[in-house]
């Protein structure tokens, strides 16, 4: 295994056509009841009303045996082995997030409560599963080592 002296804060990985198709097939079989509405409001004294809507979306949490989990876990393990070599335990949490017109997820650092107490999120992933020609917005911004934001292309998969 090759050790890397310098590790980027992010890597772009493209899903295989087969993996993308399997994920889209899984998604096409979901019903509205499989999603949970999620709206988070936080205090913002600068905003005229004192609060901001931080996140408005529908979320599906796939079960551990789903194809979404299997493919996502495979990607995490491959990227980790190639670039990071973290000690990953078998703790993976995936969210399938669906946005409607007006939905949003404001700028945030991608950390939060781990699904298992005492564990720490080491890797995070974002995959666009809808053709970017079918929507506006959805830009993903990341911070590079120079502390500058970069916008990631909204490529499918």
Describe these PLM feature segments.
Residues 1-85:
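Non-heme Fe(II)/2-oxoglutarate
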Residues 77-157:
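Catalytic core of non-heme Fe(II) oxygenases with the double-stranded beta-helix
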């Amino acid at each position: 295994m090759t050790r890397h002296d310098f590790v980027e804060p992010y890597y772009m990985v493209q899903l295989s056509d087969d993996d993308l198709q399997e994920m889209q097939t899984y998604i096409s079989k979901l019903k509205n009841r499989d999603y949970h509405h999620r709206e988070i409001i936080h205090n913002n004294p600068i905003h005229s009303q004192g609060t901001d809507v931080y996140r408005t979306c529908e979320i599906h949490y796939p079960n551990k045996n789903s194809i979404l989990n299997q493919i996502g876990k495979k990607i995490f393990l491959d990227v980790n082995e190639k670039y990071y070599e973290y000690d990953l335990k078998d703790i993976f949490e995936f969210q399938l997030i669906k946005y409607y017109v007006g939905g949003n997820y404001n700028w945030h650092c991608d950390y939060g409560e781990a699904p298992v107490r005492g564990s720490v999120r080491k890797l995070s992933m974002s995959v666009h599963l809808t053709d970017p020609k079918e929507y506006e917005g959805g830009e993903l911004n990341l911070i590079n080592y120079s502390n500058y934001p970069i916008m990631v292309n909204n490529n499918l998969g």
